[in-house]
Amino acid sequence: MKKYRKITLILLLIVMGMQGVKAQDVGFSQFYANPLYLNPAFAGSKVAPRISLTYRAQWPGLVSAFTTVSGSYDQYIPDLHGGIGAILMSDRQGDHGMLGTTTMGAMYSFRFRVHEDIYINLALQASLTNARLVWDENTMRWPSQTDPSGGFINTSSAVAPDKTSIIYPEFASGVMVYGPAWYAGFAAHHLNRPSQGFYSEDRVPIKYSANAGGLINLSEERRRQSSLGLGQPVVSPNFIYQYQGGFHYFNYGLYLDWMPFLVGVWYRNGIENSDAFIFMVGVQQDYFKIGYSYDATVSELANSTAGAHEVTLGILLPVPEQKHKIKAIRCPSF
């Protein structure tokens, strides 16, 4: 019985996605390991060319219901007075990837100084998304076909949509304000509210994201300039808030960065319910970083979903020669 409850939950979630019912974006736990996804204003924020890779398996207890792979590249271009970036993300839902989306995006972030060591980044992003449905009546099962005692016993009257693949453009914008040891940002995605439903014209709700944090050196020794927190303990408290389609998400916690090790813990919740505790460990060198996080679900879905696993990889390439030294945003990399 428990098995069929899990399958039914998967199908209900997929049907909601097919019909465009308050579709929600994928949520990553290691926000700053996938910075361009959080806010396009992060493009070029590290100055050096940066490659970011993320793999996320959400709710593996539901037959790998949600699997997401993301990759991005960005760097600062002095002649453009800002950073450029590109992101590619693929998301699969359901057994055998029944419902999937692939998004390709490009962005530009203009940077300017407002006061001594205080800077602002303003960014625009354009993306193209392909949503696709694998319609196979031999393997698809619907909630109306289930019987708690006997499994799948009924026939389905579900009708295939006219199109099983749709492509649509979308746009986003963002802003970042930062100083020597603090940062804050705001971003809005799906500004044009594209329709992604296979059966209806329901539109993707705009996603609003706000983030803020700081860096606190626990050692009184003068920090080295070659690498953030090299060999010294640094605590980074941070906060992220997101709103989309009537749903609120709060994520607050901190990192402890003690080169070459990094650990973090956060708590994520909505307004009326708890979601998960997030635990992260990582290893880093000057130009190479890898992290792993686990979402320990504390909501009513805890017994069925088995949380979420996320693995990230970050690579910084050598900085091209520049006439003037450019300051990077000093925020976590995981």
What does each of the following model-derived ranges do?
Residues 24-334:
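Subset of outer-membrane beta-barrel
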Residues 4-16:
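Sec-dependent N-terminal signal peptides
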